[in-house]
């Protein structure tokens, strides 16, 4: 059983959904980003979704773009990120770890080389944000070769054929987007999504985690009530880092408290 299947099975047994925070590796510095991961896990994060800083993040709003800029300012490179991933994996051997990246980051290392590096660092899944499921073949082949789950986005306006492909080609979990546009806590998730979740279920898709605009516990409760296996929150987490990174101790406390509140909302 892969790490995500184990996670969902364990959570189902105690009637909980998953809460998965997203942060950018290297934000605000490589060492502080390790402390941030510790705070997220201490707060109850069920899995991690992590970014590698990229200069043109087309799916991201200003908050996560700012995280990438801070990571660049601290001279964080992709190699640094893989080193951080290895350290996170060594510390948390059972925690599902996913990467959310852009195609250029994968391509510049050659697709096989990138996924091999992910395997060596202990990464469980990769979502390539700017590669739609219809164009995923070389990425999916490399992921399968190195035992990495391929995560695909189920768009809110996706037709049945797209959702069927997401279901058939994806593994680990399905990233269900609650609204069109870019990431950002400023624009709330657009409910309801129960119709999309039901369609994905009919196609035997991996469990759906709802993302984009998830910033408060009520939205986590709504996502789980609609049938999602959990929720992903990125911009709201990164906003705490943006606001408080000059005071690391306070920032880490706020991050832990935020995750505790979001995780508490996953009780079914």
Curated annotation (Swiss-Prot):
<dbReference type="InterPro" id="IPR011060">
    <property type="entry name" value="RibuloseP-bd_barrel"/>
</dbReference>
<feature type="active site" description="Proton acceptor">
    <location>
        <position position="60"/>
    </location>
</feature>
<keyword id="KW-0028">Amino-acid biosynthesis</keyword>
<dbReference type="GO" id="GO:0005829">
    <property type="term" value="C:cytosol"/>
</dbReference>
<dbReference type="InterPro" id="IPR018204">
    <property type="entry name" value="Trp_synthase_alpha_AS"/>
</dbReference>
<comment type="subunit">
    <text>Tetramer of two alpha and two beta chains.</text>
</comment>
<feature type="active site" description="Proton acceptor">
    <location>
        <position position="49"/>
    </location>
</feature>
<comment type="function">
    <text>The alpha subunit is responsible for the aldol cleavage of indoleglycerol phosphate to indole and glyceraldehyde 3-phosphate.</text>
</comment>
<dbReference type="Pfam" id="PF00290">
    <property type="entry name" value="Trp_syntA"/>
</dbReference>
<protein>
    <recommendedName>
        <fullName>Tryptophan synthase alpha chain</fullName>
        <ecNumber>4.2.1.20</ecNumber>
    </recommendedName>
</protein>
<dbReference type="GO" id="GO:0004834">
    <property type="term" value="F:tryptophan synthase activity"/>
</dbReference>
<keyword id="KW-0057">Aromatic amino acid biosynthesis</keyword>
<keyword id="KW-0822">Tryptophan biosynthesis</keyword>
<comment type="similarity">
    <text>Belongs to the TrpA family.</text>
</comment>
<comment type="pathway">
    <text>Amino-acid biosynthesis; L-tryptophan biosynthesis; L-tryptophan from chorismate: step 5/5.</text>
</comment>
<keyword id="KW-0456">Lyase</keyword>
<dbReference type="InterPro" id="IPR013785">
    <property type="entry name" value="Aldolase_TIM"/>
</dbReference>
<dbReference type="InterPro" id="IPR002028">
    <property type="entry name" value="Trp_synthase_suA"/>
</dbReference>
